[in-house]
């Protein structure tokens, strides 16, 4: 059994949960690589990544390269003398980095590969109405999320679950799967499976303003899945127009109501405590939303200070 000397690479909160589990299982993490500090928010203050915050709090050796091919970074990386690297929600690695340790570099990806390769697997699984998803560990190669698979674990997606809730459950599942992967590697019992490509593979495209916008002519399930799949971040959005005022709103939570009606898709109907949007097979009842420059609020709270006319619509 070879004693593992691990370098961990990751940036967001999802990666922190995995790193914490590795540390708590008494593995030797000789270095942590995370994104360089960036200014964020209105004040453009320097913001540390979640992984950096964790590494500093736990006195772990930390490197923050801007260029992964930089000679000085590569020298520092080599000097850590790791025999295994683990990547969780980081960035694409050059070959000179991923082939450095003799036991290889493996990645934890939040989908059942080969489906949902790419930047936003948790979101797209919900957006596309999947009923199950999971996590996969695989050895990195020179493409994105295509390497030989080591282990995977599957869970059901709950009918009303949003991306944030699924994120947390997959982080827990991923932690267990990474530890199981470490055990087979250190015992020399790794059996990998090649990913098979076919035309039915679904992709986890990068999220942008365009693919986060609600199309109110789609079915109720499609709209509701988009809202769930983008909540709480970055959030599904649309335009709201009432008389001469137009603004963009973010919708965090909604409910599908299958009721017959004769309204045009996008018509907004509001009562004293509820807002419903007409769609082709019923209504989408809005539960939680955000107006520009305001905080997120429940619909009942919004209706305490605002009323809508009969002309109100979304698009």
From Swiss-Prot:
Origin organism lineage: Bacteria, Pseudomonadati, Bacteroidota, Flavobacteriia, Flavobacteriales
Protein name: Methionyl-tRNA formyltransferase
Broad EC category: transferase
Gene Ontology annotations for the cellular component aspect, listed alphabetically: cytosol
Function, in words: Attaches a formyl group to the free amino group of methionyl-tRNA(fMet). The formyl group appears to play a dual role in the initiator identity of N-formylmethionyl-tRNA by promoting its recognition by IF2 and preventing the misappropriation of this tRNA by the elongation apparatus.
Entry binding sites for (6S)-5,6,7,8-tetrahydrofolate: 111-114
Stated family: Belongs to the Fmt family.
Any one GO molecular-function label of the UniProt entry: methionyl-tRNA formyltransferase activity
Species for this entry: Flavobacterium johnsoniae (strain ATCC 17061 / DSM 2064 / JCM 8514 / BCRC 14874 / CCUG 350202 / NBRC 14942 / NCIMB 11054 / UW101) (Cytophaga johnsonae)
Record's keyword terms, sorted: Protein biosynthesis, Transferase
SUPFAM superfamilies for the chain: FMT C-terminal domain-like, Formyltransferase
A Pfam family it matches: Formyl_trans_N
Alphabetized InterPro entries for the sequence: Fmt, Formyl_trans_C, Formyl_transf_N, Formyl_transf_N_sf, Formyl_transferase-like_C_sf, Met-tRNA-FMT_C, Met-tRNA-FMT_N
Catalytic activity: L-methionyl-tRNA(fMet) + (6R)-10-formyltetrahydrofolate = N-formyl-L-methionyl-tRNA(fMet) + (6S)-5,6,7,8-tetrahydrofolate + H(+)
Coiled coil regions in record: none
Record has Glycoprotein as a keyword: no
Enzyme Commission number(s) from the entry: 2.1.2.9
Gene of this entry: fmt
